[in-house]
Every structure is written in structure tokens, then in C-alpha cells.
Design a protein with these regions (language model features):
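Non-heme Fe(II) oxygenase catalytic core, chiefly the N-lobe of the double-stranded beta-helix
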Residues: 2-259
């Protein structure tokens, strides 16, 4: 193995000076990098009329306060929430006292809702999926993914409402795929720009489909292709659109070659 160079790049917004340290390990660079520092500075400079925002990560995640989602919010407030979501990629609202119907009402302000074909829903609110996790329940969500990329038109966003959470653990993690794209070496970025990924429901949900119904379900939800690098429709930023759960392979390559 080679040596690892841990590098902290000069970041005026954080008051850091350049420092280098070599330790035995993998040949990678770690630490604040210029494209993250620039985006973080931009996000910290944003201001909002209908709520306050507190950044939670360097370039992803913000807590929005001073807004009641159970109310019928005016359209300018909804547009500003959408703009905040576009900017921070994920937003959090604490201590919201909402019913299931209010949850759905808020979600409908942002577009058409869908019913998940594999997760169980309820008759009263079929657009809602209830997740229950505990010592007696298993799961397979502990892999990075974007929801329902196996659809021809994947969901734009997901709205989670926590009803009961543990004191420790149970975390949901989020990654900034714009920052991931910006941080690619130039040769990998050029290669990724020309690739298309094949997405399939079968990698995650195939075992839930009875064998006698598999062909029927495949006809309803056939494999779809999406670019590995996409452009956000409102911000214009480029981002990586691949994940280990739903991407079966890269077009023109075998699954083994795609890893």
C-alpha cells in the first residue's frame, strides 16, 4: 500500500490554513476541498422570508424553522420551501403536529403523488407508506439509493414524517450527489458523462413478487435507462444518478464490468 495524504485546503469561510499530514493507509485525499467550500459559502449566504434555515452539513441538509406545515401555506411560502429544497437538497422541519391528511395535503402542493406498487399502503391513504422498524423487523435500506429510480419517471422527492424514533440509532443519511459529481477526477467525469445506467425493480423487490406474476410485473415496470449524470431542472447543477440498489448495470457493459 502507498501513503495517504490528508489535505485541508485553505478555506476562508472556515478559517482553515493549508496543512498536510502523511499516514500509512490508502492512497486518497481527505479534507475540505475548494468546490465544497465555495458551495458551503453560497448556501450560508441564503436568506428566506417565510422561515429561518440552519445548515446541518457542509453542502447538504438544513433545518427550517418558524413555519407550520399543518396550515394552508400561501403559495409564496410553498415556492420558497421548494427553492430551499433545491438549494440544500434535503430539508428538515422539527416538532410538526400533523395528521396523515395534512401530510398528504402538504405533499400535494409540490406535485402529483404516486402509490408505491411494492410497499404496503392503507386503504384510507394509499399514497402513504408506513415503515415500522425494530428488533423483530428486518430491512435492506442500509445502502445508498434514490427512491424508485426504476420508474420511467422517477419521483422528484420524498416527504418523510417521523412518528416515533429511538433515542439512539435509526438514522437516515443523505448524500450530496452534486458534490460527488463536482469532486470526480476529470477523467472519471468525462467517462461518466457518456454513460447510461439500466435500472430495475428486481434487485430490491424481485423476491416480493410471486414467480407466477413476475412476467406480468416486468411488463408493468420494465427495465429503464437513465443517464449516469443528470442536470437538475431548476438549478442547472449536474449530479450523479446511480445507486447500488436499483442500478443493474451500465448500458453496454456486463454487471461485473459495471461495478
Amino acid at each position: 500500500m502507498g501513503e495517504t495524504e490528508i489535505l485541508a485546503v485553505d478555506d476562508p469561510s472556515a478559517g482553515l490554513e493549508i496543512r498536510r499530514r502523511r499516514v500509512p493507509g490508502y492512497p486518497i485525499n481527505l479534507g475540505p476541498v475548494p468546490h465544497l467550500a465555495e458551495e458551503r459559502t453560497r448556501l450560508h449566504g441564503l436568506s428566506w422570508e417565510h422561515f429561518d434555515a440552519r445548515m446541518l452539513g457542509s453542502t447538504v441538509g438544513a433545518e427550517l424553522s418558524g413555519i407550520d406545515l399543518a396550515r394552508a401555506l400561501p403559495e409564496p411560502a410553498i415556492r420558497e420551501v421548494q427553492l430551499a429544497l433545491d438549494s440544500y437538497k434535503v430539508v428538515f422541519f422539527r416538532d410538526q403536529d400533523m395528521t396523515a391528511e395534512q401530510h398528504l395535503g402538504f405533499a400535494r402542493r409540490f406535485g402529483e403523488l404516486e402509490v408505491h406498487p411494492f410497499f404496503p399502503s392503507n386503504e384510507m391513504q394509499p399514497e402513504l407508506v408506513k415503515f415500522t422498524k425494530g428488533v423483530d423487523t428486518g430491512g435492506y435500506e442500509n445502502q445508498w439509493h434514490h427512491d424508485v429510480t426504476w420508474r420511467e419517471r422517477p419521483s422528484r422527492s420524498t416527504i418523510l414524517r417521523a412518528l416515533e424514533v429511538p433515542d439512539v440509532g435509526g438514522d437516515t443519511l443523505f448524500a450530496d450527489m452534486c458534490a460527488a459529481y463536482d469532486g470526480l477526477p476529470e477523467d472519471l467525469r468525462v467517462e461518466a458523462e457518456g454513460l447510461t445506467a439500466i435500472h430495475s425493480f428486481e434487485r430490491a423487490f424481485g423476491r416480493q413478487v410471486p414467480p407466477e406474476r413476475m412476467e406480468e410485473v416486468r411488463a408493468l415496470y420494465p427495465e429503464v435507462s437513465h443517464p449516469v449524470v443528470c442536470t437538475h431542472e431548476r438549478t442547472g447543477r449536474r449530479y450523479l444518478y446511480v445507486n447500488r440498489i436499483f442500478v443493474d448495470r451500465i448500458a453496454g457493459r456486463t454487471r461485473a464490468e459495471s461495478l
